[in-house]
A protein has these predicted regions:
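FAD-binding FR-type
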Residues: 1-5
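Conserved AdoMet/S-adenosylmethionine-binding subsite of the radical SAM
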Residues: 7, 11-151, 155-157
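A structural motif corresponding to the C-terminal lobe/cap of the Radical SAM core domain
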Residues: 141, 157-180
Length: 183
């Protein structure tokens, strides 16, 4: 699909965006792996007067951010851990670039919301560290604690794969305590 084909479809909901204060959010997998297309689409959306956001895990080259930054009003930024060893244990990848890119977004003056997936037995101990890190940034407009759920378990079974996801779900009290750290 092309930008020219997408823009009329996205513009159909303009009244909803205007009434809700919303706009176009690019997400799915890691949309910034397609930074050139994202930049072209965001540029067209801005030219059409639409508000824009990008949902990202931040583990992409800085050049991807440079391409979309001029056309992005807000970033939704996943932050799983501050401690590199915790991040590597869960994802197999370092979080250095993720943290550097979030600092970069902040330095560029762009608004962002941190989204913290809260997973017992993985990163529950990271909430205070994430809160302390976020407080060093000036453009954060909020933090959402996203409680872990095990809905993917049935998908593993259907695919005949071993489910390696944690079994424990966070309690409402644990989630509330984590969210309180960000107030």
């Amino acid at each position: 699909m092309t930008v020219d084909a997408l823009l009329p479809l996205l513009s159909e909901d303009r009244a909803f965006y205007d009434n809700s204060g919303g706009g176009i959010t690019l997400f799915g997998g890691e949309c910034l792996l397609q930074a050139d297309f994202c930049a072209a689409l965001l540029k067209a959306c801005k030219a059409a007067g639409l508000r824009t956001a990008v949902d990202t895990c931040g583990d992409v080259p800085r050049a991807a951010f440079d391409k979309v930054m001029p056309y992005t009003d807000r970033f939704l930024y996943d932050l799983k851990a501050i401690d590199e060893d915790v991040h590597i244990a869960a994802t197999g990848r370092s979080n250095r670039r993720i943290l550097e890119n979030l600092r970069y977004i902040d330095a560029c003056g762009k608004a962002f919301e941190v989204r913290y997936p809260f997973v017992p037995d993985y990163n529950a101990d990271q909430a205070e560290k994430i809160a302390a890190f976020v407080k060093t940034l000036s453009r954060c407009v909020g933090v959402k604690v996203l409680p872990y759920h095990n809905l993917a378990g049935s998908k593993y079974a259907a695919l005949g794969m071993k489910n390696t996801l944690p079994a424990a779900l966070p309690t409402a009290a644990e989630v509330a305590a984590a969210q309180k750290l960000f107030e």
